[in-house]
């Protein structure tokens, strides 16, 4: 199954039955089920509103929304001019969230992101005190543009905010507003003079989302829309409080043990030192995915199932989020590069070879 294929809704096969079993043991009450239905309707409305401004990019939009409702952060990889900034700014308007764009440059300092303390004098008493001036990180939606163009010290300040949802300045911790979502961008072409994110920091991003060129028909529509001098109005669908409530619902969606075991087989099959790893994994990978991949596969599958109006997770949900979760967590070696094998190729083969049901040979995928 390729990333471009939209996984089907629940089917009547064994995968669907596994998901339904989880639904029977649901921790969601009647009120929660109403909230699930509301999120499905809101998702369709958000997609319709985004469609007024954004042409195409359906997978990108779905994956960004999944990561938001799963309380994750995403790394967006694509060449300039593919509407990355427009997507995020438009989405923040649909969700009634504050938006901030940070352009990462080699001279950007951590305080330029987090904020700084300044001395403020009381005119009445003459007393001087420190006052914290918030930086651009204090917004609900952050676009970290070209994150690999700034030094590691500044990258670390952003990553602390992502992980801890707070910043440290002057020895004091300052909580960030919720909901909080970071979307960082990278240009895959220009790598000279950049500071690539190490694997340990890449692992903190829930999704690695690829933005490709539009199709011919989509590009025609883009030219028609952007050369007439009119800007479409976007309606607000949700607000921050509702998003936080929906994020809590996503966390409570039950997952059948069989689906959890399926996720485990997928991730463990990428680890070259494990017996479960197929031969082609050992031939093509230098390193595999860690436990955080399994966690994000489950969270992403939960969020997707709710966006599609279901209160249980199926294997199709896992497969739909496998590409953005795994592509930056598996490291190809020189043999794979020499043979033209990409992470997408490897992930696709893993999905094809890994059984959904436990056959008694956990991880016994076809060797290559």
PLM regions and their residue ranges:
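Pre-Walker A (pre-P-loop) alpha-helix and adjacent loop at the N terminus of AAA/AAA+ ATPase modules
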Residues: 35-82, 268
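Walker A/P-loop
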Residues: 68-106
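Conserved alpha-helical scaffold flanking the Walker A/P-loop in AAA+ ATPase domains
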Residues: 63-66, 122-143
